[in-house]
């Protein structure tokens, strides 16, 4: 009787395990569209306890954003002055206030922003100033969808934090277009094959591959010797820039954390020495 109950329990457990396995497989989805694609994992400079952003890579990445990504994607949460903050791509120690940085002023002035005329109340257009936020590419979401085949281009200012996989995902997504499509994989007209995208289909066409060998980095700051603008290099640089955009206070946070740990360490040593000194006196035998 006990053996029969044990057999039932064993069979029930095996059935439950198989059921859970089926659920896990279903949740994982069909990955045949990946066609052997293996994610690449660059050595990002901002990872680790003491990691920080690569200034030159961010400057090149900003150029890639402006000349490639800016045609569709916004930077809704980024102001021009943020580019000149400490830890930012164009930080200059001589201009603690980024609003005074001439490079930031020049960058902002390249954009046209809407404003309100203080006398008439009319909507006017003027050159941007460091305090302005990056203006939207499209006036509204409907216009953005109309210009992109019904798809809404996501805001890129926090995209690295908003996507699972973070910087690695963005980097691989930009490279994934070059991977060969399986022969039996169907693509709806207006979509493109990318094994990194869930389902293998994406509305955004290849952005960097057509520029391989045709894109040229500019020297925004003196002393730079930019590398060749290969697809991999452009993907790395623009991802570095977007990683900073999504977490601009990363370096300041790590610095504050390090100083806090140092303070706690010194405090612990002082408390231990005080403890030893106090208890040394208390442990001495009482004379008399």
What are these regions (language model features)?
Residues 38-63, 74-88, 246-254:
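Electrostatic cytochrome c docking/interface patches
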Residues 65-76, 238:
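The canonical Cys-X-X-Cys-His
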Residues 253-288:
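Juxtamembrane interface at the cytosolic side of transmembrane helices
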